[in-house]
């Protein structure tokens, strides 16, 4: 598979609303594999298709429990609240305090276009919200409470 270039803040593609995936083509499967490779190479916990320049509703996440592929994800339910540092591969070297739901339930399709629902708490809930925001042209910095701060490579999400 191939590594893709991660777009950084200021790139207009990050501000656009992504289109739903209508069918799973070989090209879309290749994109998903490339996104996973790119996320792991960058030591991230999540990556959305617009971060690699593709305006499709696809995200990949791995919070340490194995990869999760979400095609056309929709948040069904949220509850609770958590505030913590959040970073983004599209805003390297920075982080900021963001409040997100502590529980999230999402409806999505997997890499084979099989429908499923997934629940996440804590870091997984944060990652799901963060990545789905990308699909609607939003970056976490829009939600930061206070100022961004510098982070070392090991701390980045």
What are these language model-derived features?
Residues 1-157:
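Positively charged
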């Amino acid at each position: 598979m191939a590594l893709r270039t991660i777009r950084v803040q200021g790139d207009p593609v990050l501000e656009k609303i992504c289109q739903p995936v209508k069918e799973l083509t070989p090209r879309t499967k290749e994109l998903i594999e490339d996104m996973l490779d790119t996320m792991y190479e960058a030591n991230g916990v999540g990556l959305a298709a617009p971060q690699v320049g593709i305006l499709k509703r696809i995200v990949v996440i791995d919070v340490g429990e194995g990869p999760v592929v979400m095609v056309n994800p929709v948040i069904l339910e949220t509850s609770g609240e958590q505030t913590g540092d959040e970073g983004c591969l599209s805003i390297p070297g920075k982080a900021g305090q963001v409040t997100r739901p502590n529980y999230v339930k999402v409806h999505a399709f997997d890499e084979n276009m099989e429908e499923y629902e997934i629940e996440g708490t804590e870091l997984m809930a944060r990652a799901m919200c963060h990545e789905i925001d990308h699909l609607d042209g939003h970056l976490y910095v829009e939600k930061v409470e206070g100022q961004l701060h510098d982070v070392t490579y090991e701390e980045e999400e």
